[in-house]
């Protein structure tokens, strides 16, 4: 995304009139998910300063309160870049933040645009009651990922399938529900809080949990964009 991200972290790039990361934060608030954590790496201090300028600080709780869609949202931060000099990859960052999270929680990447996605409270509660350790949303494959990532069974199980075996695969949207137990043995040996700053990719962990039958999924066919290039960003902002 350079040169755009030389001075502005990707989640703060403007998409249709507001920072990219505010779209999912507002959607979460609409469903009553008002305790949110922002995980930062590149230019993390710029992200925190942005929210500091718009929030009231709650020093006793190390939180900041922000008004989104008439809902007061409490925002916490987990700073990979400040603490370890760079990003810890997706799973490593989640594990770093685990002590600040509830037993089940939403995750969405800061560089995807899904303006019509509903962070459903009913789906969340169903997931909490289930045996699944993860529930992920898949999307039809975009041009930049034509082979897809994971399969989907008729019963809603996410499948760890080989891309070259003729299976129908879909792209992982990055939106997911997780339980803390996914980031613990036997699937993960990195301790909660990731005190050593170990880089840990999410896909191998998810694939292992899929093989154990512990990951469910569903297909999202609404608007979705991985805002990974200046051209994709420009295309989004040119849409009417």
Language model features by range: what are they?
Residues 1-4:
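A phosphate-binding catalytic loop at a beta-strand-loop-alpha-helix junction
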Residues 11, 74-76, 133, 157, ...:
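Conserved beta-strand segments of alpha/beta enzyme cores
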Residues 14, 18-108, 119, 185, ...:
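Conserved N-terminal catalytic core of the sugar/cofactor nucleotidyltransferase
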Residues 41, 78-80, 137, 161, ...:
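Conserved beta-strand termini and adjacent loop/short-helix elements that scaffold enzyme active sites
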Residues 105-106, 113, 117-129, 141-144, ...:
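Catalytic-core segments of class I nucleotidyltransferases/pyrophosphorylases
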Residues 134-149:
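Short beta-strand-to-loop element that shapes/binds the nucleotide-sugar donor at the catalytic cleft/hinge
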Residues 151-157:
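Short acidic-glycine loop/turn motifs at beta-strand connectors
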